[in-house]
Amino acid sequence: GTASFVDANTMKVVKNDGEIMNVTGTSILLTIGTRPYRPPHIPFDGEAVLDSDEILEIKELPRSMIVVGAGVIGIEYATIFSALDTQVTVVEPRETMLEFIDKEIVEDFAYQLRDRNMKLIFGQKAEKVERDESGKCLVSLGNGRVLKAETVLFAAGRVGATDTLNLSACGLEADSRGRLKVDPETFQTSVPNIYAAGDIIGFPSLASTSMEQGLSLIHI
């Protein structure tokens, strides 16, 4: 089912069978996670222009793919498809990838990826994504260059899945990416009895750290 706030201590739960119930507690922990960021100027179609959830549903292995975003998810999928002999090009507006990892490790990793014939384009933003008459995907970069591939995977970030929680009812407000700010020691939000952990609080947004955050909250 789904849940949303009634007040700081109460949540309305709508079960899959339509039954509605209110659940009350002295403390509430939010670990609702994130979903792919889908900016309006990207023409997602579930067929050739895909987000990181939709890519799991493809029916055929593309011959070529442009991955927009060189974060953890983008690079994970880029290496997977490259290993399956898809010609992969990664586009990233920043000057490097995986910025939170040691620079020397990233440089060596980038060398290995290029050695496997993966193209890495750093310092260029994907300004426009469209499909031509043949169905191929075209990605226009900030420098005027146009890339062509069978598939585009847009993996430039994720947003907190907080829009259905009715946060205003409990006094919370998410940032522009749907994330919640917490005390880094206690994971307490601005509302004293409400806590949040995992991807919903932002960096580093890794499964391992999210698990540790959840475990630490059990003992608070």
Regions found by a protein language model. Name each.
Residues 46, 56-57, 62-66, 72-143, ...:
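Rossmann-like dinucleotide-binding cores of NAD(P)H-dependent redox enzymes
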